[in-house]
From Swiss-Prot:
Species classification: Eukaryota, Metazoa, Ecdysozoa, Arthropoda, Hexapoda
Biased composition (Basic and acidic residues): 227-247, 354-364, 372-384
Organism of derivation: Drosophila melanogaster (Fruit fly)
Record note on domains: The YXXXXLphi motif mediates interaction with eIF4E1.
GO annotation, cellular component aspect: cytoplasm; cytosol; nucleus; P-body
Gene Ontology molecular function: eukaryotic initiation factor 4E binding; mRNA binding
Protein's recorded name: Eukaryotic translation initiation factor 4E transporter
Pfam families: EIF4E-T
Localization (cell): Cytoplasm, P-body; Cytoplasm; Nucleus
Motif (YXXXXLphi motif): 10-16
Positions of the UniProt region annotated as Disordered: 154-182, 196-277, 289-320, 354-391, 921-960
Gene from which the chain derives: 4E-T
Amino acid sequence: MDTSKISARYSKVDLLALRYEGKSRQRPQCSTRLELQTLGFWKINLNTAALTVSSAYSNQNKNRLSPEADNSSLICSNSSSISSRRAMRNRERANNYYQRFVPTDSLLISGEDKDKDALSHGQPYKLNIIDHRSISSSHLMPAFAKRRFVISKGSNSEESNEGINTCASKGKAASSPSRKGSELDTAETCLNFVQPDHDQCMSSSPTFSTSRQERRIGSGRLLPRSDNWDYKNEKTVEASIENEKETSPNGSGSTSSLNQHNQSQHRSRTFSGRLVERVPEVTDRRFQYDSKKSFDRQGINNRRISGKEPFSTQSRSKRGNSYLIHEEPEWFSAGPKSQLETIDLHGFEDLEKNEERSVTEDKNNQIQQLDKNLDAQASKDEASMRNSNDSLNFREVIPSDEKKHTDENVVTSIQNSTDLGHPNKNKPIQMQPSQNPESEFNFDAFLNMHPLDNSVLSNDETGKSDSKGTSRFSRWFRQKEAANNNEFPGFRESHAQEKRGIPSVKDLEAQMIKVDMRTDLINPIAGSLCQTVQMEKPIARDTEAFKKLLQQLGSQARQHHPCNDDCRTINLSNIANHVHLESKLHQKINDGHLQQPELSVNVPTMPTSSHVFLQKRLEIQHLIQRLHCGDVSHDFLEKELDNPSTPAATKDVIATVLNEYSHSKRNPVVTGDPNIFTQQSFLQPQSVHQHYSQELHSQNTANHTINQLISHGNSPTPLAFTPTSVLRKMTADKDTQSPSTYCQNPQYHVHQQNAKQVGTRENVLEPQLTATMAVQPRMILGGGNFAIGQNNQHLSPNMSQSRNQQVLKWTSGNMQMVHGKTFGRPILKGGLNSMPHSNSALPFTAHKIEMQPIHQPHLQQQQHRFKAVQSVESNLNTESVHQNITSPVGWHQLYMQHQQQHHHTRQQLSQRVIYGEMHRQSNPQMSPPVPGFSDSSDSGNVIKANSLTSPSYQRDERISSPTNQLAQWFSPELLAKASAGKLPLLNVNQALSLEEFERSIQHSSGVVHN
């Protein structure tokens, strides 16, 4: 053993070889020397049996030392976990160096026979099987791996070459060494070329491609953790160069030439980007278009091999690798591997150039033929348009022969157009006649191919419709109706000029709106005549279906309108246009032609105060008539009145009917007095518009919906417990009756009480008084301080009288002070202009009260009645009705603006009539019951009578009364100023009561009305 072996007695490669499973169980060959046995690294067994077993094991596992088995085991182990090329190179190099010690030891021992003889003669040959856990060289790996090229190219190069050559020469001599030599040959062959073949089989699938770890972005493949992007190409280039160096000294000609062929083939596969040798040109798609760029590609490949482009990560190297071998889709492995790359798209421009040459010749012929056909078609279309225009303008029905002629035109045009498309079916036809400026596309010729009526498609009214600002497409819609049967008479003249024209989109929308605005007041005969005329005209299929839809909508509207459940919402601007319909309605009411189910819903306006009041009044009258006829029994009405599930409004109507029916039996003259009812129905609704304007939010609902809403007024909803309403209930209910009676059936009790006290004429006008009191919003301050004048001393004796009576708290002349207690403070929503009729609230004049003290009992009785009705009706109206108001601010303002414009003058007249009636009730001897308008002295007296209030009495009453809470809310200075009349006059129309304001705050999360 010379010094060279001593220096390499336990080399780094031996430690590297311990990483393999097969090698780690075997002792390195150099460990058999006696110098190493003293170190005690290895456990030594000197048993002969163990030696024989170990020798058999070593002889059996000689080929275990060969890298074939290790490579096979490596391939199997690497298939599960993808390792980098660097780790593969480390293992192969360790295997290489370990293999080079085998021939030297075999030369010493001289073959298997010498081995066996020496082992059997008891030489101290150590056991090859070791415990690999006794030494761990894994922590030495990084340092060895960094210097592996220095080791391979340095001291061991001569020794390795000598070993290989001696092994090769030895392998050609004897039988048993020849097996070893062939083993070594194949071992080196495998060392150099198993890895490329392994790369071949693994690069076919990018999952196992360890030779090139690049993979397509987004393909879902994970990059290996040990892969380094920076010097990867350098490693592959160095590996290929070293493989060439290692194969060149081998003298084995056939195997080396075969391996060089394999290596060059693999290199061409790896770096050329295509299967050059394997795949014929016909099957590769990219050879059809890449022939120009092959030289450029080769330059790119040379640059890649030499490693001059370290950052170009062989973007197109994988496209053809697995192309026809494993049939993997191209997008799996091909494509960009980093975000810095771009994709080349080849061949499309060449394809387009080739196709353009073949297509342009056909196009020229086609365009010439198309021009001829289009010119002929245009002349035919002009003729057919003239015929159709004549037929449309002068005849309503097209004759059958003209229809056949136009149909023939349609068929020929279809045939011509299809014949144009057929000559070149196999090629993509790109007919663009707009490229030729002479041949513009005729849309009429194209659209006439549709099997519609030509009279619908082409007419001469397109200029008109364009001037009207209609849509481009509106000329293919024709109005089949002479006039829409849903129109009002005012709309018919406006649409008369469009009878034979084609309606625009706006006209169609207007027709849809008119279907909603349909009313039965219009003569139905005209609508039926319109329909019969329309059905005679020729109708296209599409427009016929559209018109049928309109007719269905109209019939639905006709079905809904007799019922009381579908009243459409219409703008206030439409109300001004249809005031004459209201006059028609009042005329029919006075004539007695309008029945109850058709009430107020047939009118296309929203239910104003007059409509709601008239409907309620006519319900009462209709029920009274049925009572007289015997259709409805008195007992049934009483049962309904006692039924707790009956809505409050229904109970109100029933109670009124029972009262009037009982009084009509006593005084049958009243029911037959038409003048009183005429005054009520026509004049009274304008005076109480404020009260019923609160029900305007129910304009889209029917009467039973209103009743259901009102029925919730008695329920303890959160709306019933605003602070002002609770305060008003605490003070108002103590005046006349116990509150428990009001909780059960307040309206009925009050009406029964009034039936015992007051006369017939008072009962007839009782809803008017109730509504009049409900008109005034609840004013804490300001109600009753409208016109406080200098005549404060007139009623001082009457004041002292009425204060002594327990029932009466205020004078009869101070009607508004009743409301001054029960109505809330106004919240001003507009200017401070005073209401024109606000001073006319008192029905009793000062001079008549002073001149006639005889009628003081009548006065007290009337005041008691007013007080009773007020205390309950204010409870009902401000609770039951106002509770159902969603947002009183919006519609209150809206309705007030509209109502002030239209009904202002009639308000004053009707109020004068009402207060004249009230005055005649309280003074029957002085004023005969003339049903007409009251004399002009009433208005002056009313203004006088409004100033009868005593401010000192009011202030004393407000502060001293234990039931009044005003002193808790307002300072004495403000109360004194208010009682002195220094607060501004309030426009009641623009005032919102405190109670309504509190409810609107509670409703602030509800529906918002603009």
